[in-house]
A protein has these predicted regions:
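Short glycine/proline-enriched coil/turn segments at helix->beta-strand junctions
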Residues: 1-5, 49-51, 190-191
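Gly/Ser/Thr-rich beta-alpha loop segments that engage phosphate groups in nucleotides
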Residues: 17-18, 33, 68, 182
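Dinucleotide-binding Rossmann-like beta1-alpha1 core, especially the glycine-rich loop
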Residues: 24-98
Length: 191
């Protein structure tokens, strides 16, 4: 399978930023990596190369406004300061989805999908940090599957109590049993 391809690497090891390193017995992934594909071909390929993936459930948290709340923020404002929760709820409720012509970039899409509170208290600042560019410069063709829009009931529930429902495409994922995400690149190299 694919034995006639050439792979170019900047470093002397495989994986680029999808690698792991060991520091005093602790394994660190170079970046945030989880595998949530449902593509049977990819899953079979990973099995063939011996990537030894485990199925896991996401348990991710966000530190925001001096508190910890579950990921994703848009469905889990419980525990945040009351004024932040109120802004997020009001913004989500007031959002009427009539401004369809104003979704030309990621920032506009964020306001459109989640309302002013969620956009300004989390999505926009986090996007600037994560992507390193102004959200007005990002396109929107990738976001619907990556950023789930919870129902109003889910937003209200997530504001008044801790909810453990997993939203989005990576609520369940696969991750190597040993040596972090870099195990996949090393398995490919040795296949």
């Amino acid at each position: 399978y694919h034995s006639n391809g050439t792979i170019y690497e900047k470093n002397s090891f495989p994986g680029g930023h999808a690698r792991s390193h060991n520091d005093n017995g602790f394994v660190f992934d170079e970046g945030i990596h989880v595998l949530h594909t449902k593509n049977k071909y990819i899953l079979e390929l990973l099995k063939k190369i011996g990537a030894n993936l485990q199925f896991r459930e996401r348990d991710a948290w966000i530190v925001s406004h001096g508190a910890m709340t579950r990921y994703p923020f848009q469905a889990n404002t419980y525990g945040l300061p009351t004024d932040i929760v109120k802004d997020c709820l009001i913004g989500f409720i007031e959002n009427d989805f009539t401004q369809t012509d104003k979704k030309k970039n990621y920032q506009d899409w964020t306001y459109y999908m989640f309302g002013k509170g969620i956009a300004e208290h989390f999505m926009i600042p986090y996007s600037k940090k994560f992507w390193g560019v102004d959200p007005k410069l990002l396109t929107t063709d990738w976001v619907n599957v990556r950023h789930p829009r919870p129902s109003l009931d889910e937003v209200i529930t997530g504001a008044i109590q801790d909810q453990s429902k997993r939203f989005g495409i990576n609520g369940n994922y696969r991750y190597p049993e040993t040596y972090g995400f870099g195990n996949i690149a090393e398995s490919l190299e040795n296949a």
